[in-house]
Amino acid sequence: MAKLTKRMRVIRDKVDSTKQYDISEAVALLKELATAKFVESVDVAVNLGIDARKSDQNVRGATVLPHGTGRSVRVAVFTQGANAEAAKAAGADLVGMDDLADQIKKGEFNFDVVIASPDAMRVVGQLGQILGPRGLMPNPKVGTVTPNVAEAVKNAKAGQVRYRNDKNGIIHTTIGKVDFESDKLKENLEALLVALKKAKPTQAKGVYIKKVSLSTTMGAGVAVDQSGLSTTTA
């Protein structure tokens, strides 16, 4: 049996794996246990009551967190003409068409998000085998293929998170950094859960959001009591 590290022993002693913590208590615990030499991210895992084997029950989308993620996001935009100028004005880091595609083909990936206007998909489509495996391929379902590229750039810069369930029906994403104020992490989590509820497949039956767990980059998962969260959809 592998020997537990000092950090793992502390986590084991502090975290009750059978308990659902109030959000404030959960965040306080994460902050206490975040002892890495860098500012850890606060990640969330949401277990959904879906059958991930069925395509009509898969959940995918994007939402802007009210307090961002704490990450600096570099955005590349495939577009031209007036849209190119609008994208630059909105803060895009890279804007182009064939020239941008050539950079990517050479292995230059100086960006975290790729956005494209519909007329640019003829160029972007050639990059599917490069961008797809990296999770960077623009998709209208998450708002990264859009005629309004300026708005998409602003959303990406403002802290938009993209989500997609895995084969077990679990959503994994980030809701900020461990040095965020507790209320901001709570509001970010609530915004994500509201977005997930709005994206609920009509075919999904029974309890939809089954479990919510928070963790830091190097920490253990802490289950959150959903009754302490405001997730009513409009």
UniProtKB/Swiss-Prot annotation:
First and last residue of the signal peptide: none
Gene Ontology CC, one term: cytosolic large ribosomal subunit
GO molecular function, one term: structural constituent of ribosome
Family matches, as SUPFAM superfamilies: Ribosomal protein L1 (SSF56808)
Record keyword Membrane present: no
Keyword Ribonucleoprotein: yes
InterPro entries found in the cross-reference section: Ribosom_uL1_bac-type (IPR005878), Ribosomal_uL1 (IPR002143), Ribosomal_uL1-like (IPR023674), Ribosomal_uL1/biogenesis (IPR028364), Ribosomal_uL1_3-a/b-sand (IPR016095), Ribosomal_uL1_CS (IPR023673)
Keywords from the UniProt entry: Repressor, Ribonucleoprotein, Ribosomal protein, RNA-binding, rRNA-binding, Translation regulation, tRNA-binding
SUBUNIT field: Part of the 50S ribosomal subunit.
Function: Binds directly to 23S rRNA. The L1 stalk is quite mobile in the ribosome, and is involved in E site tRNA release.
Listed name of the protein: Large ribosomal subunit protein uL1
Organism: Sodalis glossinidius (strain morsitans)
Lineage: Bacteria, Pseudomonadati, Pseudomonadota, Gammaproteobacteria, Enterobacterales
